[in-house]
């Protein structure tokens, strides 16, 4: 009898232990579910908050440049009149008769006035104040180069170029300079007008425009020093007209912090450049393009920079100014660390007259950049580009927009019309886009 009681008690104890274990397991599972539900609730609440904060942080540290409306006659000016015009660009802006009449009346009134020495001094003082204000945003960009002489002795050389402060976020101060200033280096020394020297890095280069963007991180150590740093606002180069006053700052004489004044003599629209077109301005003064010469309007806004891209053509000279309005999308991407995709062609929209004669609508290719993606894909001068990926191409604007949506390293399908013996034939090629 005692043995039966022992067996009963032993079994009962096992059942009680099993119940306790099951109860503990149930509590643990319930706690796990509660924790999971709590974590999910916290995630649902905090994720949107964190995402919002991340977006706000990104917005605070990104740069947005307001786009300028085109001149209005851009599409008609862009059309190809003949294959020879695809290189030079033929659009020339002439003032309307009414505006010209008003300008002549103003000029006549100015000529009839007798200016005193006091008037001249006052005008000179106004120009000087404007130049001094703009010069505060000019910096000297220097990078050291290590070399060796014939006896293998270490030599250090440096060259100075002009940079221009154009934007400031919570985390960095951004400058424009020339690609010559950052050749062979990713780090440069920036010297401010007040004498401070700081290290900056090359954010991006653009070989097509010879432009580079520098980034100087804003830290606790330099925040106070950079708090009042002047930056030059972007202007609208489309508004420039012949006879307008221009300020040349940076290094127009080949020396940093030099300045020149001049007047705009001529405007040429839709000049063919790689993968697009630009507006070129011809002033009555020269500047040093490689060293960095930045061009401001009378309001002290950046409207362009001196370029030597057209120095070998008859249509332009070494004093040409590249207008900023056509290039604002590219500059904005550079300042935000985004490289512009490169196809590597020069061309112009096929005009109405040519279409009536049987040429397909699209962009007539006048030249292909050697070793560019277009060259590697087999594109040739005389081809007419009609599509890039899913984008229909009829104008250079269409090509620019399609490349804006593309990225370096992306493979795109290009549809071309190539002139055969009797008619244009459709050809498809694939190009891997490079960076500019």
Feature map (PLM): residue ranges:
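Active-site substrate-binding loop(s) of clan PA
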Residues: 201-203, 221-255, 284-286, 322, ...
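C-terminal cap/linker of serine protease catalytic domains
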Residues: 39-41, 298, 302-358, 423-424, ...
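Catalytic-histidine neighborhood of serine endopeptidases
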Residues: 48-56, 168-210, 216-219, 228
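Active-site-proximal beta-strands of protease catalytic cores
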Residues: 43-44, 173-178, 239-252, 284, ...
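N-terminal targeting leaders that route proteins to membranes or the secretory/organellar pathways
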Residues: 1-150, 187, 222-223, 302
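PDZ/PDZ-like groove recognition
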Residues: 155, 335-402, 410, 415-436
